[in-house]
């Protein structure tokens, strides 16, 4: 962000899906908020949540930073004299959640002199090798010399998201000696596809599961780590040794720095 933009009463609105798990929020969205306030002290930095369920669940009184809806923050920033608005839509990929945010911002363009909306980290414009390099460092931290398989566990897939992941996975596999699989909780290939392939292979494996989710919170705990019905539970029942990384991607400084590098 240039000094010229700063003098034009700029504002940065961070929008995340949010988590009702306050610790998960503190580890990602609240860090975005604090770090951007420090990086751009002349800008009005605000944050909002896009998920109605999160807003219903979260205790606003206990939150570390202000908890607001997107309309609330747009009205506030307009009232505070922001003319040039930059929206950091903090999403990993172009999912429904991302386009919901875009749909809420677009009608408000006339309220500001300029409005920019960030793309998700995984998109068709940026070099897939860049995000593969960042993820490779994270996988190296999660795996060890005994790891037989690294499973990247994402939440939701559609045709566009699956295509965007392909060159990233190709690069990751070139750089990693351990086989890597990407699966989705909602989408294909899913948990059952992984279990079927492992059954066909017919041997017990030492598996490391790394969540491809920005927040650690509810989905990680329930879908990947719960004692019953989770990916970890199903793999263990099939005879495999399983380690699940406890971090959401947004907890890694390199991921947050990639957001900043690409968008400011």
Predicted feature locations:
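Active-site-proximal alpha-helix that buttresses catalytic centers in soluble enzyme cores
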Residues: 1-264
């Amino acid at each position: 962000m240039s000094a010229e933009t700063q003098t034009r009463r700029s504002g940065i609105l961070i929008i995340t899906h949010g988590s009702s798990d306050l610790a998960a929020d503190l580890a990602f969205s609240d860090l975005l908020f604090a770090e951007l306030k420090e990086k751009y002290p002349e800008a009005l930095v605000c944050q909002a949540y896009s998920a109605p369920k999160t807003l219903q669940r979260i205790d606003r009184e206990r939150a570390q930073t202000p908890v607001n809806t997107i309309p609330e923050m747009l009205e506030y920033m307009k009232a505070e004299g922001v003319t040039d608005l930059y929206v950091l839509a903090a999403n990993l990929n172009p999912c429904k959640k991302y386009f919901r945010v875009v749909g809420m911002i677009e009608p408000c363009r006339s309220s500001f002199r300029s409005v920019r909306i960030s793309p998700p980290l995984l998109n068709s414009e940026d070099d897939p090798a860049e995000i593969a390099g960042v993820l490779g460092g994270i996988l190296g931290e999660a795996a060890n010399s005994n790891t037989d398989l690294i499973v990247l566990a994402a939440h939701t897939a559609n045709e566009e998201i699956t295509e965007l992941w392909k060159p990233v996975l190709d690069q990751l596999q070139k750089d990693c000696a351990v086989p890597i699989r990407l699966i989705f909780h909602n989408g294909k290939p899913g948990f059952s596809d992984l279990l079927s392939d492992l059954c066909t292979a017919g041997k017990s494996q030492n598996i490391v599961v790394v969540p491809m989710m920005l927040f650690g919170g509810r989905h990680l705990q329930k879908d990947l780590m719960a004692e019953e019905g989770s990916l970890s539970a199903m793999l263990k029942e099939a005879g495999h040794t399983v380690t699940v990384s406890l971090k959401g991607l947004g907890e890694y400084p390199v991921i947050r720095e990639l957001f900043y590098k690409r968008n400011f």
